C-alpha cells in the first residue's frame, strides 16, 4: 500500500472539495468545543484538514497511503457513523469479525459491558429458563 505514489496536486484538489463538503456537517462547532460530559476528546475538524493541506504543501506525504490514513484518522476522530469516505488505497482492505458485539447492562443498573452477541443471547436464554 505504501508503494502507491502520491500526487500533491490531486490531494490539494481533494482537500478543497472535501472542505466544501464538510461545511455541511452540523456538528463541527460541537466537535470543536464539546460539553464537559461528552465522552470523546474535542477535534477541530477544519483545522486538522488545514493541517493536512499544509502537510501536502510541505511535502510531508511520501505516498498515497500516508495521506489517506491522515484523512481517515480525522474522520474517525469525529465519531460519527454518518461520515464515511471510501478512498482509493485504503478502501480494498477492511478488518472485520464475523462475530457481532453489543454493549449492554446485565441488569439495567450496572454500567454496560461489551459482549459477543452469541454469548449474550445464550446468557439471556439460560437466564429466562431459570
Give a label for each model feature.
Residues 1-130:
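Terminal targeting/pro-maturation regions of precursor/exported proteins
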Amino acid at each position: 500500500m505504501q508503494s502507491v505514489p502520491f500526487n500533491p496536486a490531486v490531494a490539494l484538489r481533494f482537500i478543497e472539495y472535501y472542505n466544501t463538503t464538510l461545511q455541511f456537517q452540523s456538528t463541527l462547532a460541537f466537535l470543536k468545543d464539546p460539553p464537559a460530559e461528552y465522552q470523546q476528546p474535542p477535534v477541530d475538524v477544519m483545522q486538522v484538514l488545514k493541517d493536512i493541506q499544509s502537510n501536502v504543501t510541505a511535502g510531508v506525504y511520501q505516498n498515497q497511503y500516508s495521506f489517506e490514513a491522515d484523512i481517515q484518522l480525522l474522520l474517525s476522530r469525529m465519531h460519527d457513523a454518518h461520515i464515511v469516505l471510501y478512498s482509493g488505497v485504503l478502501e480494498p482492505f477492511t478488518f472485520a469479525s464475523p462475530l457481532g458485539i453489543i454493549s449492554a447492562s446485565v441488569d439495567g443498573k450496572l454500567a454496560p459491558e461489551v459482549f459477543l452477541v452469541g454469548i449474550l443471547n445464550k446468557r439471556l436464554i439460560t437466564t429466562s429458563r431459570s
